[in-house]
Amino acid sequence: MTAISPFYYHKSISAFLKEDESAIFSALEIADDHADVKATQRDVWVDEVLILKKELSGFTGDIIFEYSIPRLGKRIDVVVLIKGIIFVLEFKGGCSKINRSSREQVWDYALDLKYFHEASLFAPIVPMLVPFGACKSELEIERSKYHDQVYEPIILKKNEIAAAVRKFLEKEHSASPLNGFLWAKSRYSPTPTIIQAATELYRGHNVKSITRKGATGKSLERTTRAVLEVIRDAKKKNEKCICFVTGVPGAGKTLIGLNVAIQQNAIAKNISGEKAVYLSGNQPLVEVLSEALARDQYNREIVLKKNLFEKVDRKSGEKSRKKGYTLAEARIAVHSFIQIVHHYRKVMLAKLKHPFGDALEIDTRNCVKSEKDGYAEVDRIAIFDEAQRAWTCNELAGWLKRKKRLTGFKWSEPEFLIWSMDQHPGWAVIICLVGGGQEINRGEAGISEWIKAINKSFPKWKVYIPEELFNKDFSDKEAKSELSACKSKKLLPNLHLTATMRSFRAKKLSAFVDSLLNMDTKCAIKTFKEIRAQKYEIVLTRDIKKAKDWLCQRARGSERFGLMASSRALRLRPLAVDVKHKASVVHWFLDDIKDIRSSVFLEDVTTEFDVQGLELDWGCVVWDGDLIYNNKGWIQRNFKGNKWQKNGDHWNRRYQINAYRVLLTRSRQGMVICVPKGDDNDPTRKTSFYDSTYKYLKSLGMMEI
């Protein structure tokens, strides 16, 4: 077995039954590189091997221990292949009562194999939970109610495995045989959520191991290498440079930013001032990612038994238990490289001399100059996600006037951020991750403002750009003009991401949503048929309860689902959908059914501002009277006081359409769109506000539930 093998041990069942237990334990120990947990793990393996040697006697097939599921950052205890059926076994030591999370865990393993493991695509998969202690078993087995042949988890006593296997063999007698060797080596092509991907990168896995093989994985890997090379070159030549990374929607630009930050910080672990910081103006994304990484790090420390240690009082010699690594410490560690851009900007603004003159000046009375970093912040590499959303001069000046009572600010946010990094003596690097097509706020400067700032104020900075910015498909004429005037630019390959990784079931979901919102009915009908053929579900209802029931019936394991609506959807309150109530995005995205703030509790609703950049498995979009279908074009409205008013502002109309674009592209596996019936007794919820939209959506081919 090689170091990159996806499993620790694989043999035919007959070979496993004949092999000496000590040889099996030795093979497992050699494969396991976690030396500090081997003693505990060995005891578990001893129990598993002894149980399975007894229970699998008389069967033919294959057995695999510790099969890796990179997307989830876990390993399946045991996979058994018998007559075309995949049995996924998860053993629980010392447990007599199985909780919800244990069921979700083994179900997640089975679903992950079904979705992303090629050799498992057409095979029945049976998740089994086997507590070592006494338990109430579930030997009454019904045929899988799901079209993909993944069974619900069953709980078995350790001496009931053989009996359960026989029952499943009777039910699935027509299953096609599986070649054990080919199955174990089969291609695993995951499409992780951004939360899952970020967590695995933070754990030390590379981007290649956690993303879909082929175009997506290769594209991400090439771009990461290209950006790291820019950083190395800047350091070597003691230069300042700005590097632009572009990509199609859902191509993984955020993942590139996080990957570069994590890899650069690993390279510069013991080198002060050479670390990278990932900065985003998307506060919900930063909050959710930061908390997810911190929780995962903290939980792994507990698993490794480093969370508690003995403290000896020097005077008395008495021993006491002291809390070790805390969640607060984990959060601080994550915050060191993932931050909200507004906080970074605020720190640098505080260093400026007031009132503002014709040039930005440091107020030397209020800050100390570092010998190594000058007046800059400590990080020499700043990664700005969604860089096109940085504010124009008018927007930033207006904010400073309203919030800080500071007037006369003459610089755009891109120019100010470049100036901030220019305070470093020697080299510095800015990475701009640039997307497009989902503007939901006014005052966004776009890529042109970054180039304009370089041309105007920082001509010595080198500019690295992807060749695609000069393609005819790139529509930003102002940016093209600024780039043409830029004397320090250099075109680099591999700075543009071309393959989407957003939905593993419907690669054309974005195209469908575009045609739906553009009212291109013919194209929408055609694209809808294509995504339905890919088993991506979109259904329609007028009943919020039916919508919630549909979500609960579709979600399996720990798959996330929840309610979403436009931030302008103010007349959904009679349905108990209140967008004015601010959801706690961290709890909404990360917590389970036990927390009423969780998405899966189906009480709190999120808006486009909460979910942009994040994903659900299954979503419900509740459609209000803020966007009404009319065959001459969308009727767009804002709710003011006690009535709806037409939205006539060009940019606000664009943001409103894009709000629905964001909401309709958040669900990875399927969604239900709920268009309420309305109530003619309520002048703000007339049935006419909803009927035309419902009929339009239904005409595209959506099934009504």
Region annotations inferred by a language model:
Residues M1-P190:
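Accessory nucleic-acid engagement/destabilization modules that flank
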Residues V245:
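Hydrophobic anchor at the beta1->P-loop junction of P-loop NTPases
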Residues R321-M421, E603-T607:
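Conserved RecA-like ASCE ATPase "motif II neighborhood" in helicase/translocase motors
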Residues K253:
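Conserved lysine of the Walker
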Residues I383-S481:
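Signature of the SF2 helicase/ATPase Hel1-core->accessory helical subdomain module
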Residues T211-C241:
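N-terminal pre-P-loop "Q-motif" helix
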Residues V429, F601-I705:
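C-terminal accessory regions
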Residues G257, I440-E444, E468-G625, Y629:
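Conserved helicase/translocase motor-coupling segment
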